[in-house]
């Protein structure tokens, strides 16, 4: 005996529409998650570029390598391009997906991060330009500078790691590390001021 379908045509239409809408929502969520995963990958890549810029800038200062300094200046355009690519992806996520709450905070945080990382590239290029055009005497102060460079590289790595993993503990360590870098900066500045005062002609 055939089983009668008790749904009216209108009810069946509503049910089909609901199924289609749920499928559309799932598809949009999957696409959004895929784009977020891509965002994470691109942030990791940009973080690596910034770490390399810091490391190479320290080497350039240590060795007064003018040719390597020119490479760092050129490398800044790669970091700038990475920033633009990530910014475009974030804008696409905001316009197409219209994220709210946690998702919106995630995209907004990425936009803030790339601004700060792009600034690292700019600073590295600025230092490289100085090395390429002037004599920077190598002294004991380079030890402090090396500590600053290593601490800053670790901060970049940990900050991106905290973002990707959503790890509050790592984020707190990054905040604490900033105090260490600030202390090294003050120490370095005092040493440089002492040198200038003792050798005003060189300053």
What do the predicted segments below correspond to?
Residues 1-7:
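Compositionally biased, intrinsically disordered low-complexity regions used as flexible
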Residues 7, 19-203:
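Cytosolic, long alpha-helical scaffolding segments
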């Amino acid at each position: 005996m055939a089983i009668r379908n008790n749904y009216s045509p209108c009810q069946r239409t509503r049910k089909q529409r609901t199924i289609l809408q749920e499928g559309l929502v799932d598809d949009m969520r999957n696409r959004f998650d895929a784009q977020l995963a891509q965002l994470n990958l691109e942030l990791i890549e940009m973080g690596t570029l910034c770490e390399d810029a810091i490391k190479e800038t320290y080497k350039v200062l240590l060795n007064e390598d003018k040719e390597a300094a020119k490479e760092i200046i050129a490398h800044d355009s790669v970091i700038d391009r990475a920033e633009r690519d990530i910014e475009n992806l974030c804008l696409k996520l905001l316009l197409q997906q219209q994220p709210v709450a946690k998702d919106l905070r995630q995209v907004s945080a990425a936009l803030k991060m790339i601004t700060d990382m792009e600034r690292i590239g700019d600073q590295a290029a600025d230092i490289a330009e100085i090395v390429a055009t002037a004599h920077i005497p190598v002294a004991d102060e380079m030890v402090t500078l090396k500590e600053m460079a290593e601490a800053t590289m670790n901060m970049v790595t940990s900050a991106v790691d905290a973002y990707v993993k959503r790890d509050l503990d790592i984020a707190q360590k990054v905040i604490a590390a900033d105090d260490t870098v600030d202390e090294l900066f003050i120490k370095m500045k005092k040493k440089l001021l002492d040198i200038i005062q003792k050798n005003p002609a060189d300053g």
